Amino acid sequence: MSCLMVERCGEILFENPDQNAKCVCMLGDIRLRGQTGVRAERRGSYPFIDFRLLNSTTYSGEIGTKKKVKRLLSFQRYFHASRLLRGIIPQAPLHLLDEDYLGQARHMLSKVGMWDFDIFLFDRLTNGNSLVTLLCHLFNTHGLIHHFKLDMVTLHRFLVMVQEDYHSQNPYHNAVHAADVTQAMHCYLKEPKLASFLTPLDIMLGLLAAAAHDVDHPGVNQPFLIKTNHHLANLYQNMSVLENHHWRSTIGMLRESRLLAHLPKEMTQDIEQQLGSLILATDINRQNEFLTRLKAHLHNKDLRLEDAQDRHFMLQIALKCADICNPCRIWEMSKQWSERVCEEFYRQGELEQKFELEISPLCNQQKDSIPSIQIGFMSYIVEPLFREWAHFTGNSTLSENMLGHLAHNKAQWKSLLPRQHRSRGSSGSGPDHDHAGQGTESEEQEGDSP
C-alpha cells in the first residue's frame, strides 16, 4: 500500500481512500486508526524514524544489516512483550473511581497537598488509575481547564494515553511513580516563595512534566541501552537517551490527542519546548550542573522570579526534587519505594547476566544491599539538592519536614546495614547508578528514587 509522508506532526496519509487512516509516527507513540477495523496499537519503542536510523547508520564498521536489527529488536521484544498485546487484547473499560471506594478516594483528594499523602493507597482506591484521577483533579483545582479552555473528554483521553504508556511490570518506573512525582510537584508549586509568581502556564507545565517525565520507561538505565546498542541510544547519540524518549513520547501523545490543538501554534510550540527542557533536566548526569547553578543563584541572591527564565529554572529544580523525593517521605512509604527501585536494579542485573554482559553498578543483588544503595543515594544525590531547596524556600515547613524524614530514613537504613559495613558506612553508591542508587535515567535507574 503506498503512502505519502507529510512533514507536519510526522503523519503518514494513505492515498487509498478505502484505507483512509492516519498514523502518527512520533517517537514513543505509534497508533493506526482507520475504517478497516484495525485496533489501535501503542508501541513506544517502534517508531518509523528509528528503523530508518538503524538501517542507514554504520557503527564500528558494521552496516545496519537485518541480522543486527533482529538482534536489537530481540531486546525490544523482551521489554515490550506485554505492551505489544495491547492492540490485540480487549481492555476492560476505564473507571476513574470504583463506586465502592468513591468516598475514600474523594476524601484523599481533599488532602492531596499534604506531604504524607499515601499514593499507594490512592492507587488502590482508584482501581489503578491514580495518575489519571490525580491529574484531572489537579487541573481542575488549579483552574487550568477553565483558563486554557481544555475539553475535559480530550484531557481525560490524553491522560489515559500517558498512564497506559507506563509499564506496569516495572517495579519502580510505572504510573504510580509518575503519580507520586506529580503529587510532590503539586506540593512544591504551593510553596509560598514560588507560588505567588507562578502563571497558569507554569503550573500546567510543571504538572504535565511531572506526569510524563518517565513515560514508556523500559525498566533499565541508559548505560544498559548503550552497551546493548539499543536503537534509542543510537538515535540520541548516547545523550540523555531516556529523557529524550520520554519527551518525544509526550509530544506525540499531546499531538495525537489534540489536547492543545485549539491554542495558537506559537504557544503550543513553546509548551512543547518547555516540556522538553523540564523533562531533560531530570537526567541525573546533569545533577551537578543544576546544583551548581542553584547554589550560585542563592549565594548571589539574583533569582528574579518575575522573570520567566528564572521561574522555568526553579520549575526544573522542583521537578528534580519531586523525581527523587522518596527518601524524604515518611519511612513506611519511603521504604516501599526503596525496595521497588532496587528490585528494578536487580532485574537489570539478572538480564545483564543472562546476556553475558557486565553487571552494572548497584544491580548485583549478591553484592549491593538495599541499605547501602539507599544510604549512598541519600548522601550523594538527595541531601545536597534538598538542602539547597530548603535554602530557596526559606526553610519552609515542608522543607523542614522533608529534611527531617530524610535524616530519620537514613538512620533507619544505617541500622539495617550488614554488620561488616557499618563501621565504614555504605558500600558506596555514588552518583554512579543513576541516581546513584537510584537512578539515573541516564542511568536512570532510578534516578528516580531510592
Curated annotation (Swiss-Prot):
Tissue expression notes: Highly expressed in brain. Also expressed in heart, liver, skeletal muscle and pancreas.
PDEase domain: residues covered: 97-420
Residue(s) carrying Phosphoserine: S426
Free-text remark on how the cofactor is bound: Binds 2 divalent metal cations per subunit. Site 1 may preferentially bind zinc ions, while site 2 has a preference for magnesium and/or manganese ions.
Binding site residues for a divalent metal cation 2: D214
Enzyme Commission number(s) of this protein: 3.1.4.53
Coiled-coil blocks: none
Binding site for a divalent metal cation 1: H177, H213, D214, D323
Source domain of life: Eukaryota
Gene Ontology process terms (BP): cAMP catabolic process; cAMP-mediated signaling; chemical synaptic transmission; signal transduction
Gene3D superfamilies listed in its UniProt record: 3'5'-cyclic nucleotide phosphodiesterase, catalytic domain
Annotated Acidic residues bias: 441-450
Free-text activity regulation comment from the record: Inhibited by dipyridamole, IBMX and SCH 51866. Insensitive to zaprinast, rolipram, and milrinone.
Pfam family of the protein (one): PDEase_I
Family the UniProt entry places it in: Belongs to the cyclic nucleotide phosphodiesterase family. PDE7 subfamily.
Record text about domains: Composed of a C-terminal catalytic domain containing two putative divalent metal sites and an N-terminal regulatory domain.
Record PANTHER family: CYCLIC NUCLEOTIDE PHOSPHODIESTERASE
Free-text function comment from the UniProt entry: Hydrolyzes the second messenger cAMP, which is a key regulator of many important physiological processes. May be involved in the control of cAMP-mediated neural activity and cAMP metabolism in the brain.
Designated name of the protein: 3',5'-cyclic-AMP phosphodiesterase 7B
